[in-house]
Amino acid sequence: MFKKSVATLMLALAVVVSAPLYAANGSAAARTSQSSLSQVEQTDLLFMREEEKVARDVYLKLYESWRLAVFSNIASAEQSHMDALLKLLRTYRLPDPAAGNAIGEFTNPALQSLYDSLMEKGQLSALDALQVGGIIEETDMRDLAGAIDRSDNVDIDTTYESLLCGSRNHLRAFAHNLESMTGQPYAALVLTQEEVDAILNSPMEQCGQR
């Protein structure tokens, strides 16, 4: 069951990885009349806004199921991440893909599929739910790093870096809970083990502070 659920999630993640790049490459990278952003930067902003919603929505629902404080605490942080991205969307006069969508509803089909897969696994057990937290945070870090590489705007990079910092802290929290439950070291689920170990072997960060 575990191998099957992980395989399903990896397929969903593969689709999610290609979604923003496909959308960006599928249209001209010209500057728009409404913003100073490239089409790639716009696509990434829209995608990241909904990806943070995936995290928030999953954590809210998993808290309802398992009553683990880590889900409630991090869901609140994910709302802050969503708010930061909404501020950028408004600054650059871009439409909000999350507008009007209830918990568990997404405009991007790849993210809808990812949410559904994560929820399916997260309902299996408290252990699976915590692993879902690790999957989400590792995925966020991978996607944020890619968006930073594709961005040429300081304000966007600053926001992404702050979110990346938050995701590192969230991964530390989920890893701590998993290690306490299993007695085993945290195993990477999306990133390389080397990347994950570097994060887990460093202390919690004060994000957004210089």
Q: Where would I find each of the regions flagged by the language model?
A:
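Bacterial N-terminal signal peptides that target proteins for export
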Residues: 1-9
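Bacterial N-terminal signal peptides
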Residues: 10-18
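Sec/Tat signal peptide C-region and signal peptidase I cleavage site
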Residues: 19-23
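N-terminal targeting leader peptides, primarily classical Sec-type signal peptides for secretion
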Residues: 10, 24-25
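All-alpha RGS (Regulator of G-protein Signaling) helical domain and cognate RGS-like helical scaffolds
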Residues: 26-210
